[in-house]
Amino acid sequence: MQNLPKWKIFLSIICTIFAVICALPNFTQVKSKYLPHDSVNLGLDLRGGAHLLLDVDFDTYLNDTMENLADTLRKSFREDKIGYKNLLVKQNNIQLELRSQEELKPLKRIISKIDPEINVEANDNRIKLSYSESRLSELLNKVVDQSIEIVRMRVDSTGTKEPILQKQGDRHILLQVPGEEDPTYLKNILGKTAKLIFHLVDENANVEEAVKGHVPMGSMLVQGDRMGYLVVKKKAILGGDSLTTAAASFDQNSQAVVSFSFNSLGSKLFGEVTKNNVGKHLAIVLDNKLLSAPTINQPIMGGSGIISGDFTVESANELALLLRAGSLPAPLKIIEERSIGPNLGADSIESGKKAGIIGFAAVCIFMVWSYGLLGLFANIALSLAMLYVLALLSLFQATLTLPGIAGIILTMGMAVDANVLIYERIKEELNKGTSNLYAIKTGFESAFATILDSNLTTLIVAFLLYIFGVGAIKGFAVALTIGIISSMFSAIIITKLLIDIWVKYFKPKKLGLV
């Protein structure tokens, strides 16, 4: 008398019930707080949307970093009374001339305190400062990683768009937003660095002379759409990194503005600046463009304020979004753009459905024709494997792409291949004259190692595709991995259990394989 392993029965029932619950949201719109409600997340090629490839302008970032370093050096040289001249930033390095060779040693001491990864090249009194290759690589990785997070916050501020963001190469970012029908909006919010800076206005400067090129030392010229030119102090009072909130609102004249609040440190500094500069103007500059320059009528100790500038409601909301997400460390350039319409995505889904149904039907017909009732058991196991795949895709919110559908269809054949291998082993045992029970037991045991080896090698390939691939290749790898795991479970556990139940309760004289 054959005993059915209770753990197999229990495991199969639990897995199947769990799979039905997880896959249910794909077939009904009814939501329940007690059940999962996530359906399969469709990729760009199935749902339609926007595809952008962004280039991180690291050269601009590096030049700005060098400019800041140059300002720091000027201050340090003055404090240490180091004589120099012609300190300039050229081609992402700093060049200067020292007063004498004796100044080189204190210069190196200052550089080592600022950043030991800065290389110092001396040719007589001429000095060239540049970052080491290791520091450049570290900075590039940091800038790209920061840019990815800020892009994510800008594109998905509400947490509902589920953008796909991946690093490509050293300085490229792949952005895919399924369901986004307006790529122009994406380009608008990604094309702005959103670097907000507060400057005191240089009240003594002559704007007309500054426009002609005679800008006072320590000041700079900025321009705005509404206010024209204005000379401001080059030193920033506060930056957008001190903001905690930013939101679109309306002033007393019902004009759209952006209200903001500083963090505790920013509030304290803002209060001190406004207290010490009552009656002067404070310029608000965004990406080197003058937004406004209100007069400081009284100290602002609350750490909040508004930005005006002829905003529409849409532009005020956009600016508030950019400020909340934070400024990009470097400008982004769009080097590739594609837009996939929802109709094309619907066509892809329909094509995928047809391919899946035809493939499934062909496999089922082949198995029944070749192995009779045992082929039917394999088809039942295959159906459950597809249910498990759908459930796992929904549970883990894996993105299903068109190549992913191809991966699932591929696993159909692999699942049946495992059953074919098992049945052929059983057939070999039956041809030797062994009993049905022994043939089934030996067939599954002898085929298991081969099935495991073949699936493990495929899993290794899928893992490598996921690690080194991007976009649709990752989707294929994920679907293939889930399909392999599900098909192995169904072929080894479900099929064996169905055959054992049939043999125990119906006691067939022949298995129909000889």
From Swiss-Prot:
GO terms for biological process: intracellular protein transmembrane transport; protein targeting; protein transport by the Sec complex. One of its GO terms (cellular component) is plasma membrane. Belongs to the SecD/SecF family. SecD subfamily. The keyword Iron does not apply. PANTHER family: PROTEIN TRANSLOCASE SUBUNIT SECD, PROTEIN-EXPORT MEMBRANE PROTEIN SEC. It comes from Rickettsia bellii (strain RML369-C). The lineage of its organism: Bacteria, Pseudomonadati, Pseudomonadota, Alphaproteobacteria, Rickettsiales. GO terms for molecular function: protein-transporting ATPase activity. InterPro entries: Acrflvin-R, SecD, SecD/SecF_arch_bac, SecD_1st, SecD_SecF_C, SecD_SecF_C_bact, SecDF_P1_head. The chain crosses the membrane at residues 7-27, 357-377, 389-409, 448-470, 482-502. This is Protein translocase subunit SecD. Forms a complex with SecF. Part of the essential Sec protein translocation apparatus which comprises SecA, SecYEG and auxiliary proteins SecDF-YajC and YidC. Part of the Sec protein translocase complex. Interacts with the SecYEG preprotein conducting channel. SecDF uses the proton motive force (PMF) to complete protein translocation after the ATP-dependent function of SecA. It is a multi-pass membrane protein. The keyword Transferase does not apply. HAMAP family: SecD_B. It is found in: Cell inner membrane. Gene3D superfamilies: 3.30.1360.200, 3.30.70.3400, Multidrug efflux transporter AcrB transmembrane domain.
